[in-house]
């Protein structure tokens, strides 16, 4: 089960709409309690993809290292990554699957014509295929 604090969800949506028509990206921070992952904050990062950023995103290894450091210094867990799919549904592509790390949550936001159209979260299963995560409604901190 994935729970997202309302403020974190609002920040992801704002980032995704502002980046349109490009894909935005960032990190999910929070904590794990039993089988529940609770996203308490996000951190937007620069889409490091060279060239056309409308259909692809990339997070630099430097940003990953800084995110791990930030999580450790703030007693948080790095739970995963979010990114937007401009004018496409919130379903992972094969490129998303190939770049995915095990145990991470991957939130995809669908932005259609500069409007938020929905979000879904995914995790790799044992066969390295994406499965949709169950989510609770946005929660207040």
Show the residue positions of the predicted features.
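Residue-level "edge-of-site" marker
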Residues: 84
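Conserved, mostly hydrophobic/aromatic
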Residues: 81
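Conserved beta-strand-loop surface patch within small alpha/beta domains used
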Residues: 1-78, 87-141
């Amino acid at each position: 089960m994935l729970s997202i604090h309302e403020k974190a969800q609002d920040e992801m949506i704002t980032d995704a709409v502002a980046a349109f028509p490009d894909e935005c990206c960032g990190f999910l921070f929070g904590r794990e309690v039993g089988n529940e992952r609770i996203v308490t904050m996000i951190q937007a990062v620069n889409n490091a993809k060279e060239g056309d950023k409308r259909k692809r995103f990339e997070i630099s290894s430097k940003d990953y290292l800084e995110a791990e450091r930030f999580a450790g210094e703030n007693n948080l867990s790095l739970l995963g990554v979010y990114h937007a799919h401009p004018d496409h549904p919130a379903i992972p592509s094969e490129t998303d699957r190939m770049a995915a790390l095990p145990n991470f949550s991957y939130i995809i936001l669908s932005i259609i014509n500069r409007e938020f159209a929905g979000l879904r979260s995914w995790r790799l299963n044992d066969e390295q295929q994406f499965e949709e995560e169950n989510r609770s409604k946005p929660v207040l901190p």
